[in-house]
């Protein structure tokens, strides 16, 4: 195992090219942890195309060509990653500050019930469409087995629906 991290780690890579990228990663629990339903909703609320908070804060304002969140639900602890591919006009520092502000706004201001309901609906639909056919079902069950809990395949829809707006602030 890796030694305990005692402080933030920052990596800066400078290469020739026009596309700047900013990514921030925060440690999250292993995939079997009870927080994963809330983390899945946060991925949707912050990282969704067109409706996500990062999209509205960066892409709508011409600061990024693309924004994303990525949090793999793994057997071991992993990272919740927030990112943006920048436009030539945007600076890395500016994009990082905007991402951090959106995270802080979510923590301090919370999530309105309409935004939460929309995120739950999108995830629910994606879950059920992903289970359309034997390949999709086998793929999802295998992912959950690899994560360490096959029953998460069955329980995810109920877990997502049970998450409250307050629970999202605590994760």
PLM region spans:
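C-terminal soluble interaction/assembly domains
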Residues: 107, 151-154
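Non-catalytic beta-strand/loop surface segments
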Residues: 1-33, 44-93, 114-125, 132, ...
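A common structural junction motif
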Residues: 100-111
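Acidic/histidine-rich, surface-exposed loop or edge segments in extracytoplasmic proteins
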Residues: 77, 148-152
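Zinc-dependent metallopeptidase catalytic helix centered on the HExxH motif
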Residues: 35-37
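C-terminal, helix-dominated tail/subdomain
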Residues: 142-149, 160
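Hydrophobic alpha-helical membrane-association signature
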Residues: 95-99
């Amino acid at each position: 195992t890796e030694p305990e991290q005692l402080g933030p780690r920052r990596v800066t890579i400078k290469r020739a090219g026009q596309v700047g990228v900013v990514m921030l990663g925060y440690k999250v629990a292993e995939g079997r942890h009870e927080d994963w339903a809330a983390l899945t909703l946060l991925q949707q609320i912050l990282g969704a195309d067109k409706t996500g908070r990062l999209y509205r804060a960066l892409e709508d304002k011409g600061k990024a060509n693309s924004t994303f969140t990525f949090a793999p639900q793994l057997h071991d602890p992993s990272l919740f990653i927030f990112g943006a591919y920048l436009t030539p006009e945007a600076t890395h520092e500016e994009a990082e500050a905007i991402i951090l502000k959106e995270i802080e706004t979510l923590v301090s201001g919370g999530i309105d019930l309409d935004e939460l309901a929309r995120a739950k609906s999108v995830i629910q639909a994606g879950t059920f469409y992903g289970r359309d056919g034997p390949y999709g079902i086998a793929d999802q069950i295998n992912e959950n087995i690899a994560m360490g809990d096959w029953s998460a395949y069955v329980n995810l829809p109920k877990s997502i629906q049970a998450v409250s707006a307050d629970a999202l602030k605590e994760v």
